[in-house]
Amino acid sequence: MREINVSQITDVIEKLCIEANEHLPEDVKCAIKTCRACEDGEIAKGILDNIIENFDIADNENVPICQDTGMACVFLEIGQDVHFVGGDLTDAINEGVRRGYDKGYLRKSVVKDPVRRGNTGDNTPAMIYTEIVPGDKVKITVGPKGFGSENMSQIRMFKPSAGLQGIKDFILEVVETAGPNPCPPMVVGVGIGGTFDKCALLAKKALMRPLDSQNPDPFYADLEKEMLEKVNKLGIGPQGFGGKTTAIGLNIETMPTHIAGMPCAVNINCHVTRHKSEVI
């Protein structure tokens, strides 16, 4: 049994909130630059040049990449041999978010109630997702999620008779409906299987995966490639002005499901696909 003081969790989350908002992952930057080299249209190339300039400035000056610094989504992979001491884990996570958004001068975007609103003033509470894994370590991932793209996301509870074609059509429908709203080029996270809630979580976890990775199952790896090509053929293009680059990545995550269902969720992210991780 390994003891970890929750103050360590707070410190790491504070740091990750700031870093994730100021520095895009290298795989995302590389994907954007690769797409820039493939674009033909002057408008599309100009927009991608602006995007590249923007994340370069954010890197060099340590400022947020986007004014929407997101709702803090915190993923914890907790080793089963870990015992947290020194306080409540949830409180420690929220304190890390509170400090990070204050210290980093990040916009506070969370309201107390979904209907009656009222800003909490510190970007808490975080959306917390935990998974118990073997070992005595804790992996923390912070993925700030903006809502221009989150609002474009959808889930559909298919019957198995919809088949693979139903899933393909749904992915394209969601992206086409989103159009310019999620600040393309976008990243598309797809979850297939599980229950209503688990399917949506799979789609969000797909957004945390590096864009230069692929699903370990060759069937779904091929589907990722096929659907990314089809999404880009929609021609929405950078910021919706047309072009070859509607999406810079499409990741699929799956899990077993009930014999009577085939849930599919599509979680859209903008080109500012932010996530940072650290292991304690």
Predicted segments, located by residue:
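Non-transmembrane, aqueous-exposed alpha-helical and coiled segments at domain scale
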Residues: 1-280
